[in-house]
């Protein structure tokens, strides 16, 4: 491994993965998604294919580019290891998303909405008939362009839920099983833990993550009212609890 690998993280471009991860970590901390050093982000460099990964144990609002780990996008070997820091325990999960989902970025948060939904729902989080669902990718493609189409507002958004493990790297096998069972999923909720979201670019992954957090927050409020989040549009009044 090169001893002078800082060139991999030195850039004045705010869109460079080493800089962008720091910006997003601060935003996610402010949203209460990544407090107490929890959560993580990884971004693939669009030109080099290198994988940039936020470290373990660093407060997200204080993250700096020199804290970044850099991984070879083909061999998955470390190209840069920041002195004194540990790699994220999520790294094997991020690598699996890159390898098997052709991800360009992965976001992992400890969102309260994701954790609460994992307590309410069983094996799947399901919600339908909400405008924000249109931000979530579907299993359909445009026949003329081949591009993945997003869900319609009245479609049902389904996000699988897996059980937590003592250590995050132990989630790799359940994650791989989820890839097989839900080949078009863009996220997985980990019960009592948080959520992993991936997309072809960091911009897409960020949008999906924000949309899902909105949908999960809404689902919790619907549950409090006695309304199943995946009930048919127009049927809500049948379920509203009488107080």
UniProtKB/Swiss-Prot annotation:
Q: Which family does it belong to?
A: Belongs to the aldolase class II family. MtnB subfamily.
Give the protein's recorded name: Methylthioribulose-1-phosphate dehydratase
Q: Where are the transmembrane segments?
A: none
State one molecular function term (GO).
zinc ion binding
Keyword tags: Amino-acid biosynthesis, Cytoplasm, Lyase, Metal-binding, Methionine biosynthesis, Zinc
Its catalytic activity? 5-(methylsulfanyl)-D-ribulose 1-phosphate = 5-methylsulfanyl-2,3-dioxopentyl phosphate + H2O
Residues recorded as binding substrate, renumbered to this chain, are: 90
For this record, the Gene Ontology CC terms, alphabetical, are:
cytoplasm
Where this protein primarily resides, as one coarse class?
Answer: cytoplasm
Name the job this protein performs.
Catalyzes the dehydration of methylthioribulose-1-phosphate (MTRu-1-P) into 2,3-diketo-5-methylthiopentyl-1-phosphate (DK-MTP-1-P).
Quote the InterPro entries the UniProt record gives: Aldolase_II/adducin_N (IPR001303), Aldolase_II/adducin_N_sf (IPR036409), MethylthioRu-1-P_deHdtase_MtnB (IPR017714), Salvage_MtnB_euk (IPR027514)
Which pathway is it part of? Amino-acid biosynthesis; L-methionine biosynthesis via salvage pathway; L-methionine from S-methyl-5-thio-alpha-D-ribose 1-phosphate: step 2/6
Which sites bind Zn(2+)? Answer: 108, 110, 193
Q: What is its EC number?
A: 4.2.1.109
> What is its EC class?
lyase
At the highest ranks, the source species' classification is: Eukaryota, Fungi, Dikarya, Ascomycota, Saccharomycotina
Any one GO biological process: L-methionine salvage from methylthioadenosine
Q: Which cofactor does it need?
A: Zn(2+)
Q: Where is the active site?
A: 131
Cofactor binding note: Binds 1 zinc ion per subunit.
Q: Which gene encodes it?
A: MDE1
Compartment(s): Cytoplasm
């Amino acid at each position: 491994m090169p001893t002078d690998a800082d060139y991999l993280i030195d850039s004045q471009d705010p869109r460079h993965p080493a800089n962008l991860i720091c910006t997003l970590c601060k935003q996610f901390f402010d949203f209460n998604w990544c407090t107490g050093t929890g959560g993580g982000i990884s971004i693939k460099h669009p030109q080099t294919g290198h994988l940039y990964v936020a470290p373990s144990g660093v407060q997200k609002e204080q993250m700096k580019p020199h804290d970044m780990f850099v991984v070879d996008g083909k061999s998955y070997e470390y190209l840069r290891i920041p002195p004194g820091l540990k790699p994220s325990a999520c790294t094997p999960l991020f690598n699996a998303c890159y390898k098997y989902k052709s991800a360009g970025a992965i976001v992992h948060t400890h969102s309260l909405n994701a954790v609460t939904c994992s307590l309410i729902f069983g094996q799947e989080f399901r919600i339908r008939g909400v405008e924000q669902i249109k931000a979530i990718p579907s299993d359909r493609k445009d026949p003329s362009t081949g591009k993945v189409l997003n869900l319609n507002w009245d479609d049902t958004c389904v996000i699988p839920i897996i059980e937590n493990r003592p250590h995050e790297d132990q989630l790799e096998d359940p994650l791989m099983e989820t890839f097989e069972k839900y080949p078009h999923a863009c996220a997985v909720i980990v019960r009592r833990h948080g959520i992993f979201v991936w997309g072809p670019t960091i911009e897409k992954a960020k949008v999906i993550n924000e949309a899902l957090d909105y949908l999960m927050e809404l689902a919790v409020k619907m549950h409090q009212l006695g309304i199943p989040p995946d009930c048919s549009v127009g049927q809500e009044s049948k379920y509203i609890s009488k107080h």
